[in-house]
From Swiss-Prot:
Listed name of the protein: 3,4-dihydroxy-2-butanone 4-phosphate synthase
Function: Catalyzes the conversion of D-ribulose 5-phosphate to formate and 3,4-dihydroxy-2-butanone 4-phosphate.
Known EC number: 4.1.99.12
Residues flagged as site, Essential for catalytic activity: 136, 174
Residues that, per the record, bind Mg(2+) 1: 38
Coiled coil (UniProt feature): none
Database matches in NCBIfam families: ribB
UniProt keyword GTP-binding present: no
Keyword Manganese applies: yes
Gene3D superfamilies: DHBP synthase
GO MF entry, a single one: magnesium ion binding
UniProt pathway annotation: Cofactor biosynthesis; riboflavin biosynthesis; 2-hydroxy-3-oxobutyl phosphate from D-ribulose 5-phosphate: step 1/1
Amino acid sequence: MNQTLLSEFGSPSQRVENALESLRNGRGVLVLDDEDRENEGDMIFAAQNMTVEQMALTIRYGSGIVCLCLTEERRQQLALPMMVERNSSHYQTAFTVTIEAAEGVSTGVSAADRLTTIRAAIKDNAKPTDLNRPGHVFPLCAQPGGVLVRGGHTEAAVDLTTLAGLKPAGVLCEVTNDDGSMAHAPEIIAFGRRHNMPVLTIEDLVAYRRALMREVS
């Protein structure tokens, strides 16, 4: 990733710290992956404090595929089977079956309904019967070990919310341009300026986590 493009958002460690503070304060962040990987930017919000307005923003400026990133432990708590037995997607993106809140939604498509579904899935005492299947929210299961094991947006969402001291669950959606094409670094940076969202890379988060591990050891 071209570090010059991101310099206005601080050093790599500052970018992570800014992202954590943003999530704690109920704001979103923008996460870029490697140029040799998907080369895309995702909006990420903490599931715990996401608002209807933020969900509407996500739907309006994103791909429309709103994903809820969960730990394996939470996936098992909700008894969510994986979408397929054999994952042949290029980056092994770990989709489960889609979900809908069993109560409190109409068609499940609106910003309010999707947020109701997310809140049902992350509440402390959530159980499988709280959710109907299929639905309009796409859960993703993060790899244990996070970005140190898999450098994906799913793992970044769970790592960031965990490091922020929030529930380990994030809502993400790929950012798209007005013409429907995928947004890359220059467009993501411009989007961050417009919507007051810090930008960081998965590479930043990997380095940050490794530094924390060195401090502990």
